[in-house]
Design a protein with these regions (language model features):
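Conserved acetyl-CoA-binding loop-helix of GNAT-fold acetyltransferases
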Residues: 77, 83-100, 119-123
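Conserved GNAT acetyl-CoA-binding A-motif
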Residues: 98-110
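Structural motif
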Residues: 67-69, 105, 139
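A structural microfeature
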Residues: 47, 130-133
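Conserved acetyl-CoA-binding loop of GNAT-fold acetyltransferases
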Residues: 122-131
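A short, well-structured alpha-helix characteristic of acyl/acetyltransferase catalytic modules
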Residues: 1-26
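Acetyl-CoA-dependent GNAT
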Residues: 23-81, 97
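Conserved beta-strand-loop-alpha-helix junction that forms the acyl-donor binding cleft
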Residues: 108-118, 134-138, 144-145
Length: 145
């Protein structure tokens, strides 16, 4: 299912090479610091999310985050579910859960030109417009507190 999602045009556009991403997601199943979820709506899987400690894999644009901060990466894999508001709903719940577990802040870093994701994250409660450079190009650092 995740392999199929990684091949949808919208996911490929932002996540890149499906084979590479599938290998990384599979490899991360054995990584205790990487938490992964399949997100469902009415018992139908539609999205993938992962969360990890911000400083576990050092990235310069996350270096200033407080110790214990969490980072989320996510995508909607079912094209029919895009634009329905489900992304913002599960991201808000996930961010609140990570805060309740002790993270002082939860970060997400959509590509600068991924306007759909940026709107969804803002509706979920993430704030921030700081443009940062990442290994994948310019992104916007958004925080949930």
């Amino acid at each position: 299912m995740v392999a199929r999602w990684l091949r949808t045009p919208e996911v490929v556009r932002w996540w890149g090479d499906p084979e590479e991403q599938e290998a990384l997601v599979t490899q991360d199943l054995d990584e205790p610091l990487m938490r992964q979820w399949i997100v469902e709506h009415e018992r139908r899987p539609f999205a993938y999310a992962q969360a990890y400690p911000a400083h576990a894999w050092p990235q310069p644009h996350l270096a200033q985050l407080p110790e214990g901060s969490a980072v989320i990466d996510a995508f909607i894999g079912e094209p029919a579910m895009l634009g329905q508001g489900h992304g913002r709903g599960f991201l808000r719940r996930l961010a609140k859960m990570l805060l309740a577990e002790g993270a002082p802040v939860v970060a997400i870093d959509p590509a600068l030109d991924n306007h759909r994701a940026r709107r969804a994250y803002a509706h979920a409660g993430f704030v921030g417009e700081m443009v940062v450079e990442t290994e994948h190009g310019p992104a916007v650092l958004m925080l949930f507190q």
